[in-house]
Amino acid sequence: MAPAVGIDLGTTYSCVGVFRDDRIDIIANDQGNRTTPSFVAFTDTERLIGDAAKNQVAMNPHNTVFDAKRLIGRRFGDAEVQADMKHWPFKVVDKSGKPIIEVEFKGETKQFTPEEISSMVLTKMRETAEAFLGGTVNNAVITVPAYFNDSQRQATKDAGLIAGLNVLRIINEPTAAAIAYGLDKKVEGERNVLIFDLGGGTFDVSLLTIEEGIFEVKATAGDTHLGGEDFDNRLVNHFVTEFKRKHKKDLSTNARALRRLRTACERAKRTLSSAAQTSIEIDSLFEGIDFYTSITRARFEELCQDLFRGTMEPVERVLRDAKIDKSSVHEIVLVGGSTRIPKIQRLVSDYFNKEANKSINPDEAVAYGAAVQAAILSGDTSSKSTNEILLLDVAPLSVGIETAGGVMTPLVKRNTTIPTKKSETFSTYSDNQPGVLIQVYEGERARTKDNNLLGKFELTGIPPAPRGVPQIEVTFDLDANGIMNVSAVEKGTGKTNKITITNDKGRLSKEDIERMLADAEKYKAEDEAEAARIQAKNGLESYAYSLKNTISEGQLQISEDDKKKVSDKIDEVISWLDNNQTAEKDEYESQQKELEGVANPIISAAYAAAGGAPGGAAPGAGAAPGGGAGFRNDGVVEENEELD
């Protein structure tokens, strides 16, 4: 079995790494890229994931899904979800409060949860690792933004389950990046390191103290809804307005035009990290109008000014929470593709009065750290690196219960090191109260109505007593994934009740996950069948054409009658191919067998007459994928071909 892997499941791109033999490999996909777009596309015939999905997005905008990370673990009514829906060409619908993605797939309307879409991306990452490692990958560490809440973490874990992975741990992205930095740098003495992680869709800042392999997170802050895509949106809006001004037409009504514009904006943004200005040229963007324009780095910075400036607020909050002065930060590490933007780098270096550290690859650092953690958690003690690391992470948000009058009483304060267990004793609010409702909230506000309800349960059967007499002990147990168990016990009777906060409102049930796992297997089998079908079609096509070339080149002594017989059959097959692009695999194979049945005896006889053929005279593409007879390119008869 292959070793455990680390997967950085990103909003826009994902990355997978493995730690073995004392080194990290960041694994390239089948296109040779070390990061894979977090895109899934559905067409009339197949499902595409990664580069193949992103490459066809302009032709198929309504059925190409991305940004699942901006939906996962959220409610349909969330302000962010509603705002994002304006930018997405795919359809998101409300299903009992959860956002569900709706697409056309093989001529039918299909619905997928964000967890399922994310699981497809995870499956692609898993397959990328399996191709490299040559074995089945079962265990993985998956990363999430440090500021992800309980339901977002749980939903990410579910996505891993649907992808058939045993999720060893959900770890925070900046913490994973800190491991990459710590291993890369071989840090001496105690260092305060600030990780500034700005990716495609999320932003995290974490402050860690690193000393002799102990990585202790002191504080974390961020915005689970800020990243490169928001900068792209600003550019898109800017150019939509410009197009309207120049041509009096609104292209925002056309999904394909918008997608082409967005792709150009993303490219322009990247160019502006190294050039002071760039041009955008899109032929026939909308209603036949060519759109040629340019943008300077200064204008781009102005368009995103508030977003860029806003990244400093979490930095200040982290320093406040950790009670560390900015002059005591030894090293600032930039992670995430968006930290390549010069303005961001300048804001950070101006704030700290020192240059940020750019020694680690911003796209790969998170997967790198996750791979190390995967090796540690799967018990790999072969290396000094894995033996000496201890990770102490924190809870990103305070968690507590509602007490009389809707007051939030936190039991676990934000930035508490996890795993942790905290207990507190409460009592009843009125005389002879038979039970209490325990409501668990997450957030920093003083009143529960302003925080996020994680779940609730009742403790009943409390014997009649005056208010304030019964002793109810509530215990919060926060595990290393940042996922919560809450229990309550009434001391007098020993009555207990507990809940694992799996966000009952939004969480997938066990049955849902099992159904989605079965669906995932089904889609995978369909993908493989489609690949085999296309291989059979291509095999038949190349066999027919190479046979045609062999006949027409006239190198073989074949009678005119035989030549006509073979040529007619080839033309018949090519014409059949043109009209049957969606035929089944066995239909292509039987066509190939028929063609071989006509051609092989004639060509074999011609070879025999010629006393063996010169190299390369035989038709290429030989056997069908099913292993039918044929010739190899070197003129040698395949072993299963009988010669008369």
Curated annotation (Swiss-Prot):
One GO CC term, this protein: cytoplasm
Composition skew (Gly residues), residue ranges: 612-630
Entry coiled-coil feature ranges: 510-600
One MF annotation (Gene Ontology) recorded for this entry: ATP-dependent protein folding chaperone
Pfam families documented for this protein: HSP70
Q: Where is this region: Disordered?
A: 610-644
Q: Does the keyword Metal-binding apply?
A: no
Q: Which keywords has UniProt assigned to this entry?
A: ATP-binding, Coiled coil, Nucleotide-binding, Stress response
Q: What induces it?
A: Up-regulated when grown with elevated levels of potassium chloride.
User: Is Coiled coil one of the keywords UniProt gives this record?
Assistant: yes
Q: Which InterPro entries match?
A: ATPase_NBD, Heat_shock_70_CS, HSP70_C_sf, HSP70_peptide-bd_sf, Hsp_70_fam
Q: From the UniProt record, give one GO term of the biological process aspect.
A: cellular response to farnesol
Q: Which NCBIfam families match?
A: PRK00290.1
What family is reported? Belongs to the heat shock protein 70 family.
What the protein does? Answer: Involved in osmoadaptation.
Q: What is this protein called?
A: Heat shock 70 kDa protein
- This protein's encoding gene: hsp70
